[in-house]
């Protein structure tokens, strides 16, 4: 049974594990292997604990048979009607089975229910699979690029946006 819900503080460890596992698969060949190999399952625990604890970010999870298989992390922007999708990840063995579509659709519904009218995100420009996924869900390219530093390497990210 699929369930999409708001993340709870007790989910933080599992969420961090999902993100780490997903990064190691999704970004292999895109991000430096040394950086990916250095990621531990608890890499995001402090960020999540702080962000969820002080409400600077909010998170949702997707469960399959009561197992957390994916997570989305979001942050309200300065424009109170706009939200930034910081991340949307699934466990690697759940990718390509329709869970991503189900999860994104549920997240979008929740964002609309919260009163958001626009969503932005950044995606590594070489992450073609993610770009296809987001464009299939109505995101458009803004032609804005930002730089990201992961480990000691620089990467270019493309900003996508969607009217909800």
Locations of the language-model features?
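Extreme N-terminal starter segment of soluble prokaryotic enzymes
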Residues: 1-3
């Amino acid at each position: 049974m699929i369930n999409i819900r708001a993340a709870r503080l007790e989910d933080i460890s599992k969420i961090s594990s999902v993100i780490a596992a997903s990064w190691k698969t999704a970004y292999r060949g895109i991000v430096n292997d040394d950086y990916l190999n250095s990621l531990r399952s608890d890499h995001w625990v402090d960020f999540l604990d702080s962000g969820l604890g002080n409400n600077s970010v909010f998170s949702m999870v997707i469960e399959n048979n009561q197992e957390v298989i994916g997570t989305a992390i979001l942050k309200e922007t300065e424009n109170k009607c706009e939200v930034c999708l910081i991340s949307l990840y699934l466990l690697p063995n759940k990718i390509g089975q329709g869970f991503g579509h189900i999860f994104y659709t549920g997240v979008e519904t929740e964002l609309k229910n919260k009163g958001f009218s626009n969503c932005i995100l950044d995606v590594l420009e070489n992450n073609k699979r993610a770009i296809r996924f987001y464009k299939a869900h109505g995101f458009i390219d803004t032609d804005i690029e930002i730089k990201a530093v992961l480990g000691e390497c620089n990467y270019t990210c493309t900003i996508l946006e969607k009217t909800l």
